[in-house]
Amino acid sequence: MAQFYSAKRRTTTRQIITVSVNDLDSFGQGVARHNGKTLFIPGLLPQENAEVTVTEDKKQYARAKVVRRLSDSPGRETPRCPHFGVCGGCQQQHASVDLQQRSKSAALARLMKHEVSEVIADVPWGYRRRARLSLNYLPKTQQLQMGFRKAGSSDIVDVKQCPILVPQLEALLPKVMACLGSLQVMRHLGHVELVQATSGTLMILRHTAPLSSADREKLERFSHSEGLDLYLAPDSEILETVSGEMPWYDSNGLRLTFSPRDFIQVNAGVNQKMVARALEWLDVQPEDRVLDLFCGMGNFTLPLATQAASVVGVEGVPALVEKGQQNARLNGLQNVTFYHENLEEDVTKQPWAKNGFDKVLLDPARAGAAGVMQQIIKLEPIRIVYVSCNPATLARDSEALLKAGYTIARLAMLDMFPHTGHLESMVLFSRVK
C-alpha cells in the first residue's frame, strides 16, 4: 500500500472519536473512515466499533490508537504468543486464520483486478523452519539478550517461545540461550540462526571475536548433546563446519542439498504445495522445453525436469547456480541447464534468450521482473506461471502480459507466512489463441 508523507506533521487534538472498522490491512491494522479520510488503527478488526484518538494526521490518511473497544469481531482470537504486540515478527495473531486469508485474498484481487481462484495453505502454527535471532550483550546486567526485533525498533525482545517456529526449533530456544549466555565471548556475538532440514537441525553462530578453546568446547558439547549440526561464522564470508554433513531437505520427491546460508523457503508445507500446483498449472508434457527465471538453487527447476524434455534455469547468484547443478547431478537429472546471468541487465544478449521455450516459470524477488517481461513475450510460451512475493510488482509486470494478449487463467494467494503481513501469490497466464 502506498503511503504519502507530508513535510510537516499535523497537530492533533487527541479528541476521542467513535469508528467502525470495515477492513484489515496487511500490517494487521483495522481500516476505518473518518471525515472522508482513511484511518489506520492497530489492534482492531473488521466489524469492530471502538473509541479511538488520532495520533497522526496526514493529507491522505490518519493513524489512531484504541481507547476502548466497544465490540468484538467474530474473527478475533486470543494471540498464542506472549510476545505478540511487542515483537515485530507477527502482526495478525489477533485475527483468525480465515479472516487473515480472506483479507489478503481481497487485497490481492483488488491489485490484480481478478478473482482469487484458491488459497494455497498448510498448518498455520509451527510452520517456520528457519529463524534468525539477534544477540545483544547488556553491560549493566552482564546478560545476553536473544530474540527478535521489536516492532518499529532496533531493540530486541527476549524470546523464550515462538509458536510459528517448527516445534523442534521452538523447543531449542531456552537451551540455545543458556548455552550462548555462558560463553566468554558473549559480548561479541552478532546473531544465531536455527534451521530445521530433513537431514536434521542446524545452528549457525555469528561471532565477531575469536572463540576461546573453552567456548569452542562448550559449543561442541552442546551441539552433540542436542544433535545439532554446528557452523561458526567469524565474518560474512567464512563459514566453518564444526559438526555435521551437507544438509538437505526433501522437495517433491527430490533430495536437495544446500549451504546453511543459502535461501530456502521457510514454509516447507506451502512450498511443496506451491511447486506441485505450479507443475499442474503449466501442464508439463514429456516434449516440453521449460524456462525457469530467477531459479535460485532449483526449487522449481529440478521438479520441472522430472516431467519435461528439457529445463533451463537462470539465476544471478553464482553459489545458487552451482548448488542447482550439484543437485541435478545428485538426483540423476541430465536434462537441466543452469545459467549464471543478471536478469536486471540486457537479457536479449544472454545465451538462454536464443532458445525456444513452450512454457515459462518465474519467481523474482520483491523488485519484480520488469527487465525480462518483453523477452518472455517474444518467446511466445503457451503458459506462464509467475510466483510473486510482492503483489504491487506482480500487478505491474502482469500489465505487459495482458497487453500482449495473455489472460489470467488462475490466481492463487499463497499463505506462506500466516500471522504476518507478508502476501505471496501465484498466477497462471495463458496465451489467447
Curated annotation (Swiss-Prot):
- By its UniProt entry, which PROSITE patterns does this protein fall under? SAM_MT_RNA_M5U, TRAM, TRMA_1, TRMA_2
Residues reported in the UniProt entry to bind S-adenosyl-L-methionine: 265, 294, 299, 315, 342, 363
Q: Which organism is it from?
A: Shigella sonnei (strain Ss046)
**What keywords is this UniProt entry annotated with?**
4Fe-4S, Iron, Iron-sulfur, Metal-binding, Methyltransferase, rRNA processing, S-adenosyl-L-methionine, Transferase
State the family it belongs to.
Answer: Belongs to the class I-like SAM-binding methyltransferase superfamily. RNA M5U methyltransferase family. RlmD subfamily.
Q: What is its EC number?
A: 2.1.1.190
The residues listed in the UniProt record as binding [4Fe-4S] cluster, with positions renumbered to this chain, are 81, 87, 90, 162
The entry lists its GO molecular-function terms as:
4 iron, 4 sulfur cluster binding; iron ion binding; RNA binding; rRNA (uridine-C5-)-methyltransferase activity
Listed Pfam families = TRAM, tRNA_U5-meth_tr
For this protein, the record's InterPro entries field holds: 23S_rRNA_MeTrfase_RlmD, MeTrfase_TrmA_AS, MeTrfase_TrmA_CS, NA-bd_OB-fold, SAM-dependent_MTases_sf, TRAM_dom, U5_MeTrfase_fam
Report the protein name in the record.
Answer: 23S rRNA (uracil(1939)-C(5))-methyltransferase RlmD
Explain the purpose of this protein: Catalyzes the formation of 5-methyl-uridine at position 1939 (m5U1939) in 23S rRNA.
Q: Where is the TRAM domain?
A: 10-68
Q: Which reaction does it catalyse?
A: uridine(1939) in 23S rRNA + S-adenosyl-L-methionine = 5-methyluridine(1939) in 23S rRNA + S-adenosyl-L-homocysteine + H(+)
